[in-house]
Amino acid sequence: MALTLEQLNSASAEQAAQMLDGLYEHTPWIAQQALTQRPFKSLAQLKYAMTRVLADAGEQAQVKLIRAHPELAGKAMVSKTLTAESTQEQTKAGLTDCTPEEFAKIQQLNANYNAKFGWPFILAVRGPRGVGLNKRQIIEAFERRLHGHPDFERQECLRNIHRIVEIRLNDKFGVEPTQGQQVWDWQEELSQYSDPGYAEKGQLTVTYLTDA
């Protein structure tokens, strides 16, 4: 049964923390600190409160959170020690059903990424609509982000973590972000007008016109 904001706002601190358990991978203090700002008028307000807690915690805490996440199709998946949430997400993306070639490719990408940045590659594998990216999309994102700057990539990992949390929170509260999905669909339709090399990937480029 889906949670409600009324239940969250009226619960004891311990009960409320239990309701939000599992949002941030092995890192309950973010939600716990955000809960001190109750009552929340909307889920958006709760999400924002959690992002501010992490932003204010500083770089060391942020990197520790990133490192608390498992690799995609990594050792934790093989040994079946993923959290229930991560298991569901990686399964939906097909990562538990890789071919030997796909598995070897992802393992090598994991190793290369970790060697360069010092933390695991983080991607919200359920994607912009929450239904799951496919393995090709995941590998393409992996390869693209391997070329990023460490400072930018740290922020990209945090952005994906917040997206993962948003999806998990929506699941807990039975929320379907229909307006956000509609905006995404519009972007997909517009992407056919992108420049060559981008349209094929479903990516939208923007051209700014200036006075002649």
What would you call each of these model-derived segments?
Residues 5-10, 22, 29-109, 113, ...:
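Aromatic-anchored, charged helix-turn/loop surface patch used as a conserved interaction hotspot
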Residues 27-28, 34, 121, 190:
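Residue-level signal for inorganic ion chemistry
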Residues 13-17:
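An amphipathic alpha-helix signature
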Residues 25, 147, 166, 170, ...:
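Generic secondary-structure signature for well-ordered alpha-helical cores
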Residues 98-172:
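C-terminal non-catalytic interaction appendages of large macromolecular assemblies
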Residues 180-210:
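N-terminal capping segment at the start of a domain
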